[in-house]
Amino acid sequence: MADDGVNPKAFPLADTNLSQKLMDLVQQAMNYKQLKKGANEATKTLNRGISEIIVMAADAEPLEILLHLPLLCEDKNVPYVFVRSKAALGRACGVTRPVIAASITQNEGSQLKSQIQKIKEDVEKLLI
């Protein structure tokens, strides 16, 4: 298990640069009330069809507790990406606890639309 002990099932894993952009976007989404925190809420947004992108933590223990999300994302055609740290994701979500999954939701007339679109394209490049 090379690569700092990150589970190989955590694919696609964002690099440092993309991780930073994702964390910034998550923070802004929180400010605009376009963020759902946690695996269960992320699942709900996918089922309701209101999710733009799913961000998951690669260091979730055990990782299997959120591996249903990539399958659901593929069914719903929603991009998803892993970041290295659940603690960093928690901080970006504005909570003191670690967060293993977050969903950025759709909002008509949102100021984040262009940023979300750009990040989606970057994430989709990882899958190629």
Swiss-Prot record:
GO terms under biological process: maturation of SSU-rRNA; mRNA splicing, via spliceosome
Protein's cellular compartments: Nucleus, Nucleolus
InterPro entries listed in its UniProt record: eL8/uL1-like, H/ACA_rnp_Nhp2-like, Ribosomal_eL30-like_sf, Ribosomal_eL8-like_CS, Ribosomal_eL8/eL30/eS12/Gad45, Ribosomal_eL8/Nhp2
Keywords (A to Z) from UniProt: mRNA processing, mRNA splicing, Nucleus, Ribonucleoprotein, RNA-binding, Spliceosome
Any single Gene Ontology cellular-component annotation: nucleolus
Pfam families: Ribosomal_L7Ae
Gene Ontology terms for molecular function: RNA binding
Disulfide bonds: none
UniProt function note: Binds to the 5'-stem-loop of U4 snRNA and may play a role in the late stage of spliceosome assembly. The protein undergoes a conformational change upon RNA-binding.
Alphabetical list of PANTHER family matching this protein: RIBOSOMAL PROTEIN L7AE FAMILY MEMBER
Family assignment from sequence similarity: Belongs to the eukaryotic ribosomal protein eL8 family.
Name of the protein this chain belongs to: Small nuclear ribonucleoprotein associated homolog 13
Species assigned in the record: Caenorhabditis elegans
Protein encoded by which gene: snu-13
